[in-house]
Amino acid sequence: MILFAGSEERGYFLEEPAKTKKMKVEYLGNAISIETQLTAILEKTMQYLVIDIEQYIDKADELATKIESIKRAKNCNVIIYAPGYVRESRIIQELNFRGIRFYIFAVGQADAKEEFERCLNGYYLQMDDPLEEEDRESAQKDMTGKRIGITGVCRRI
């Protein structure tokens, strides 16, 4: 089973990959703090726990500690749904430090579904550390030439 700690509207991208894997998806609904969902999460038996961290107002270190303790208690794969976040965000750094390796950063539902499928297949476990991998890739890029910045561009245009 896949448990989504968030609303059904935000986690709808889980449905198709779950059907492919013959798994059921359950939604907990929105909450301001992870504390309010903690009991419901601990009561369920799941193989994957997808947590929408955008809904919480908890401090980064407290949230990361709670998620780490849930991971240890339930012995399930925890996937963090953080649309629009970057790997350098404080919460992502805290979670990465605590051993959480699966993230969905995509903003669109189609891209989020693709990243979720990668998480299910263990794609991100093949990397030593996602941050180190990105650093190696950026170091290899040719630094000559001009760079410009563009804002407000959709990926599909």
Locate each region found by the language model.
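Long, basic/Gly/Ser/Thr-rich N-terminal segments
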Residues: 1-132
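Walker A/P-loop phosphate-binding motif and the immediately C-terminal alpha-helix
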Residues: 134-157
